[in-house]
Amino acid sequence: MTNITGIDGTDERDMTKAETECRKQIIPIINFLREYVPGYEKCYCISSASLIGIRETRHFKGEYTLTKDDILSARVFDDWVVKGAHFNFDVHNITGAGLDKTGMQKQFSQTKGYTIPYRCLVPVKTEGLLLCGRNISGTHIAHSNFRAMPICFALGEAAGTAAAIAVKSGISVRDVDAAKIQEKLI
C-alpha cells in the first residue's frame, strides 16, 4: 500500500529515505481504514517490515536474456528449466508513480505457459554462480512477468537442482546439461 519512486535500491542512503517515507505513509492509510472501512474503527499498526521491498534494480546479463516476445509467444526452449510459467505483465513506471506507459498491462495474449531457459540462470562472466528468482537475465518488461512468486519458486528449484547436479558430477554449473535438470524436475 505504501509506495515510493526515484529510489536507487543499491544505495543505502536512498534505502533509508525510502523506509522512512513509506513508514510515514502508514499513518494516513490507518486513518483511512478507521474512517471508511467498517470494522477497522480501532485498527492500528503493530509493526512494519524491517526492510523496504525493492521491485527492481540492476539486471544481470545471462547467457540468454528473456524477452516479452518469448513470454507472449509462449516460446518453448530446448534447455527449459521452468515450464508452464504464466502471469500477467505488471509493469511499473521506473521514472515516476503509477503504471508503465507502454500498455503492457493490457497486452496479455499469452494463452499457455511459457518456458524459461537454463541460460537465463547462468551469468555471462561469473563462474560458480547461478541466478534465480527475480534476478535472472531478462528485460525490464519480461521481469514484470517472471518476478511473480510461483515462477520464482520454480526458478529456485531449478537452480538448486542444477547446483546439486554440478556438485555431484564435479563440473561447473555452466556445464550442467539442462536435460539432466529436466529429468529431475519432471
Which role does the model predict for each range below?
Residues M1-I186:
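Flavin (FAD/FMN)-binding glycine-rich loop and adjacent Rossmann-like elements that form
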